[in-house]
Amino acid sequence: VTAPPARNVPALLLRLREEGFSGTVRVSGLPGGSIHLRNGLVGAIETPGAPTVTSALLTSGRISDEVWLAACAAEPDADRLGGHLVAEDLIGAAELEVVCTAAVFDAAFAMALSPPGGWELSDREPALVAEPGVEPRQLTEETSRRMALLSRLWGPPGELTRVRPAPVAGAGPRGSDGWLARRHRDVLDSVNGRRTPRDIAFTLGRGLYAVMLDLIRMEDLHLIQWDARTTANGRPSTAPRVPQADTTTAVRAPEAAPLPKRRPGGASPAQDVGQKKKGG
């Protein structure tokens, strides 16, 4: 008996977990992305909506561009790249695991901000993966929690990704006297009235969700302000008016969406080098 098609991506991932599937789920849409599974666990997610592990490591300066390129040349299989980085003492195993796992959760959150169009399965593609990976149910639950928290603190999370915060004139020192945490200062220094939260996340190599929370905190401290225009619920936004879908579950897809056409895969870890300076 053939099982009925999954109604959305979370349901699909649960089924693939039961099957112990190793491969890639390509999700179409904006931003869309590729979900890399190993034995049914989510090892990595690559999406234009959130910084990758590569971006996080390089933009932060944790690993230099030159060292990264040399590591990619020495170990071209991205699945084994993490082990190579640890073996060469370029990063600790625990630290790498934290970075990889955090990137999985952040990418799932970023993909959930807009309704996906459909999905298709493909063979395993090399990726810098978290070991052993994240349980799909845990990923869905955490994404739902993040969406709910942002909705309560600010409003529709999808709207927040498109606003362009600006610093408040005469707001005082930017933490030079120690009253503002370093991570908040970094976010504040990246606010210029042109960058969206996503732009800031890529500029800093930090998770989109964390940046959005920090921006809300900055607004509460009257250090930033949103565009004068507002959304229907009173929140400011420069975003074009587009229908908002129910995004309380991770990476949702319509029940009867047609499968998208195949498109080339995402960038390899080495291809992310040089992208870290974009965003404003």
Where are the regions a protein language model picked out?
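Acidic, Ser/Thr/Pro-enriched low-complexity segments and adjacent helix/loop capping patches
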Residues: V1-G280
